[in-house]
């Protein structure tokens, strides 16, 4: 499930693409979609607006170490146009408005400027996810939390996958967020590919973007149910706003959450909307 969790947007695009070219009576395997998804990852990287973006890093590392850091960033983000590293004493004479993303390895710079994000000297996996989110325009936990609502939260038993989807859809319908077209699109998608994402989590969603507003309906189940040959006890029904090129970034924002098994367990430990909001807010605040 690594590709499915890490490259959620590319996987969803690959799923939609394969569904349009494969006969509807054929079930597409996750591994087959994952293979196609890798091609979408490469295409997105090559054609991403990130190619025009510039990154500034303030660091007191030795030159040999800054070169290593710079190379690590460019290797992980080949679409970035420029990574410039400057010492602390050059910050006051640098036009930071020329840069899309600004980071530092220095704790004092980070503490004194809330627009500058801290990264590690060693550039670890957390730093990679942090830069991914920054490049995608992530401003903070609110970008994700706005898609959740207590009116779209359910904790209780469910007899089957279809019953969970129906309940989550009906909650969204009552709030004026969904219609029957959306529901049928979700079920059509379920018929051709699995929406199990690992870590006992399923994310049913429509074949295409249909809703006027992005939203996420949540179900936490005290007893796991069977979901495409796997067991599930937490379900996110995700719908992305249509006709909004920036709305699809929600998939990127969610990938950090859905690949984090510890976080999902914390959500299930106290199955309330208040705890869900608290846990989601904390993991993104800790990241930044």
Where are these regions (language model features)?
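Short hydrophobic beta-strand micro-motif common in sensory/regulatory domains
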Residues: 1-90, 96-97, 101-112, 140-148
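Cytosolic covalent-transfer regions centered on His/Cys nucleophiles
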Residues: 28-31, 53, 64, 92-288
């Amino acid at each position: 499930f690594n590709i499915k969790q890490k490259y959620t947007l590319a996987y969803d695009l690959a799923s939609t693409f394969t569904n349009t070219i494969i006969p509807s009576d054929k079930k597409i395997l996750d591994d087959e979609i994952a293979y196609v998804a890798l091609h979408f990852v490469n295409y997105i990287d090559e054609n991403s607006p990130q190619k025009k973006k510039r990154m500034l890093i303030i660091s007191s590392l030795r030159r040999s170490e800054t070169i290593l850091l710079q190379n690590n960033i460019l290797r992980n983000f080949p679409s970035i146009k420029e990574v410039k590293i400057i010492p602390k004493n050059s910050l006051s004479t640098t036009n930071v408005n020329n840069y899309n993303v600004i980071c530092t390895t220095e704790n004092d710079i980070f503490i004194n400027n809330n627009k500058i994000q801290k990264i590690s000297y060693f550039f670890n996996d957390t730093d990679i996810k942090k830069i991914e989110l920054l490049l995608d325009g992530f401003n903070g936990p609110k970008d994700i939390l706005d898609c959740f609502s207590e009116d779209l939260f359910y904790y209780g038993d469910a007899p089957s996958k279809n019953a969970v989807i129906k309940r989550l859809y009906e909650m969204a319908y009552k709030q004026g967020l969904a219609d029957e077209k959306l529901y049928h699109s979700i079920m059509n998608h379920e018929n051709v590919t699995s929406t199990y994402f690992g870590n006992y989590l399923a994310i049913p969603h429509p074949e295409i973007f249909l809703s006027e507003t992005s939203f996420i309906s949540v179900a936490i189940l005290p007893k796991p149910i069977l979901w495409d040959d796997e067991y599930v006890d937490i379900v996110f029904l995700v719908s992305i706003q249509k006709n909004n090129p920036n709305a699809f970034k929600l998939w990127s924002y969610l990938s950090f959450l859905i690949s984090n098994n510890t976080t999902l367990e914390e959500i299930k430990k106290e199955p309330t909307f208040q705890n869900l909001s608290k846990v989601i807010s904390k993991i993104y605040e800790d990241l930044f």
